[in-house]
C-alpha cells in the first residue's frame, strides 16, 4: 500500500543533490504554483483554444482561464480531503499532508501545458499525421517504442516533458518542480506501448527514467516493469476531478453566452443536480437576480460546490483502494445517483449541441489543417536539412529546441515541442506566411 508520508515530498526534480527546504512564508508547493504562473508556457495558454473559438465580442473560456478555474477547484478538493484525512489520522499533522491543497492546485495549473493549439483537434492532428498521414514513412526509421510515442502523441505526456526536460540553454530539471506536483499531473502513469485505442499514456521514452525516478522516490506502486506501468499517484484523482467538474460546467455556461443553449435549457440542466427542496430554495434566490448571466453563474457555482463535496466524499470512501492502487475510474464516476445522472445528462447535451456546433467544428477543421501542414513541412525539413527550403524553416525555430540534433527522433521531438508550444494565433500566422498568404511588413 502506498503511504502518505512518502507520497508527498518537497524534493525538487533536477535539484536532488542540493535539496534544502527554505523556511519562509511560502511552502515549496506554493513555490511550484508561483513558478508556473510566471512562466511563458503558462502565459501562452491565454491564446490557446479550450472548446470554442478564441473570443470576438463575447468572451468565453480559453486554456488559461480554464486552468485557473481548475486550480481553484483543485485547491478546494485537496484542502477538504487533507482536513478529513487528518481527522482520521492526526499523527500525519506534522507531515506534508496539510499541503495537499497547494499541491493539487499547482498540478491543476500545469495539467494543460502540453496541449497543442486549436484544442482537441490540434492534439488529434499530431498522432494522425504519423498513423495516417505522410509521417507513416518514418515508421521503418524509428524503434518501435519511439514510433508508439508519435502515433499516440498525448498532451498529458507532453506536459510532463515540458516540465522536466532540459531544453537548450535552460537549467537541468526543466521547471524544477517538486516530485509530488509532477507526479500529480501524470494521469496515465505508463508508457506509450500500453496506450491502447484511447491513445492515453503518461511519458515519452525520453522521459521514462525521469518518471521512474519520481515514482520510486514517492513509493508509487509499480504494476509492471517492461513496459513500465505504475498505479496513479493518489492526488491525480483530485486533479482529474477538478478538470471534470470545470470543463463540464464552463462549457455549459459558455454555450449559454453564445446562445447555443437557451436560458431555460441551461437553468434546467444546472438545477437537475439538486433535490426538489434545494431546487425550490435556489429558484427563490434567482428572483433577487435580474441579470440572466448572473443567474446562470449562481447556479453554476452551486453545482461546482456540490460536485466538490461529492468528489471529496468519493475519494475518502475509496482512500484505501486508491492507496492500494486498485481504484478504477474517475471520482466523478463514483458520486451519488442524482448528481451522477445530472452530470451524465450534461455530458450528453454537450456532445450533441456544443461539441458538434458549427463554430466548434469549424475551428477543429481549421486547426487540424494548420497543424498537419506545419508538421508536414517541419518534419520534412529535419529529415532533409540540406535542402535550401529546409534551412529557411529550421532557422525559424527558437534556439531552445534541439532542431539540429544528430538523432532523427530527437529532431522530430524538437518539431513537436515547437509546434505544441505555439498559440493558435502564432500557428495561424506561421501557416499563412508559409503559404504566401501573409507577408511581413517591410
Q: Each PLM stretch: what is its role?
A:
Residues 31-43, 335-341:
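Acidic, low-complexity proline/glycine-rich segments
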Residues 384, 391-439:
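C-terminal amphipathic alpha-helical interaction region
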Residues 246, 250, 254, 308-320, ...:
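Hydrophobic alpha-helix feature that most strongly marks membrane-spanning transmembrane helices
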Residues 316-398:
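Substrate-recognition/cap regions that form aromatic- and gly/pro-loop-enriched pockets
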Residues 48-58, 349-354:
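A short small-residue
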Residues 1-25, 37-48, 57, 68, ...:
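Sequence-structural signature of the catalytic-core scaffold of metal-dependent phosphohydrolases
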Residues 61-65:
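Low-complexity, highly charged intrinsically disordered N-terminal segments
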